[in-house]
A protein has these predicted regions:
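Conserved S/T- and glycine-rich ATP-binding loop of Class I adenylate-forming
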Residues: 8, 14-17, 53, 58, ...
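Conserved ATP-binding loop and adjacent catalytic segment of the adenylate-forming AMP-binding
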Residues: 176-180, 194, 198-266, 274-278, ...
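Conserved ATP-binding/catalytic segment of the ANL
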Residues: 254-321, 338
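Conserved AMP-binding A3 loop
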Residues: 9-35
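C-terminal boundary motif of the adenylate-forming
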Residues: 300, 339-348
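Conserved AMP-binding/adenylation subdomain of ANL enzymes
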Residues: 32-52, 59-151, 162-164, 171-182, ...
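Conserved pre-ATP/AMP-binding loop-to-beta segment of ANL
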Residues: 1-13, 20, 46-52
Length: 348
């Protein structure tokens, strides 16, 4: 018998950070349907014969699995690096046009460059150049403007359109900022970019939140940085930024064929072609994870009037202060994670 879209394709286990690992059942349709959308959504990354993609995430990770399938079905060349300790050598050998990494890899590259600069004049020069890179990124971001309600939540999971911001650029960097950027590039930024290879134009960051300062630094290098959001239960990315639209703090728009909404308590709910049908041999956990056909992600989020998704924390990790205020520790952790003296951080 022919394989059908609704047939089970694989079981990927959750990390177990919030309890015992659960086997997420993903169907062939969970992979194939979003993949077909990817060729239109991100054609230069997925279906360009000149693309050379280097993956640092293990393919046991759902994001790496999904991206691998997309790339193998496309026209480019795909390579895998089993150990991030070989990052620089693998990049130098393969000369990728695209990297798939976790934020920790990006932190290591940044911290290594800062440590190499050291203190004194070189250290101050690196800090100044990094500041110019972030300023260039912020000045080149795209301006939010309201879209019709239908662009935020369509009538069904297969009709949610993706907003087009290509006609809404910001005023751009000033002449003075451009001049400072050229000086910063000549003195520092070009050397950091050289570590990432001569052909690199895109980095896809996933698997964990990326600090905003770090995102702006890499974009200021002239690299297209795409962030997304997803879980094992959503077959990896259920929202993603596009090269035309990447506002600060956002993790993009719903992947075509999916919908999102915010519950009264602030939790993000999702449904659509990417969402798993449940957990393997765990009917009670499956029933608890869904409400009226919507999957409860466990993440706190907001969606602006243009459909940009922003993740603000985990529902179970909120810290309640003595004054009764709810505080998400992730905001503090992200702001501190780029410090060169900090390898790992947790706010309790």
């Amino acid at each position: 018998d022919a394989v059908k879209l609704g047939d089970e394709a694989t079981v990927i286990y959750t990390s177990g950070t919030t309890g015992m690992p659960k086997g997420v059942v993903l169907t062939h349709g969970n992979f194939i349907s979003p993949m077909l959308q990817a060729y239109d959504f991100l054609p230069l990354l997925i279906n360009d014969p000149k693309s050379r993609s280097l993956l640092f995430l293990p393919v046991a990770h759902v994001l790496a699995r999904f991206v691998m399938y997309c790339l193998l079905a496309g026209q480019g060349i795909t390579a895998f690096s089993p150990d991030t300790r070989n990052l620089v050598n693998d990049i130098a050998t393969f000369k990728p046009t695209m990297l798939l990494v976790v934020p920790r890899v990006m932190e290591k590259v940044y911290n290594a460059a800062a440590a190499k600069a050291g203190g004194g004049m070189k250290g101050r020069m690196f800090a100044w150049a990094a500041k110019q890179a972030r300023a260039l990124s912020k000045a080149s971001a795209y301006v939010d403007s309201p879209l019709p309600e239908s662009a935020v939540a369509g009538p069904g999971p297969d009709t949610t359109p993706i907003p087009d911001a290509s006609a809404m650029p910001s005023p751009g960097p000033s002449t003075a900022l451009k001049l400072r950027g050229r000086v910063a590039d000549a003195l520092v930024l070009s050397k950091v970019r050289a570590i990432l290879g001569p052909n690199l134009h895109t980095i896809i960051s996933g698997g964990a939140p990326l600090a905003l300062d770090l995102a702006n630094f890499y974009r200021g290098l002239g690299i297209t940085l795409l962030q997304g959001y997803g879980l094992s239960e959503t077959t990896g990315p259920i929202s993603v930024e596009t090269p035309q639209d990447f506002p600060p703090d956002s993790v993009g728009f719903p992947w075509p064929g999916n919908r999102m909404k915010i519950a009264p308590d602030g939790e993000l709910l999702v449904q659509g072609i990417s969402v798993s049908k449940g957990y393997h041999n765990l009917p009670e956990a499956t029933a608890e994870a869904y409400v009226d056909g919507w999957f409860k992600t466990g993440d706190l989020a907001s969606i602006d009037d243009r459909g940009h998704l922003r993740i603000t924390g985990r529902k179970k990790e909120l810290i309640v202060t003595a004054g009764g205020k709810n505080v998400s520790p992730e905001v503090l952790e992200e702001s501190l994670s780029t410090h060169p003296l900090i390898a790992n951080i947790i706010v309790v």
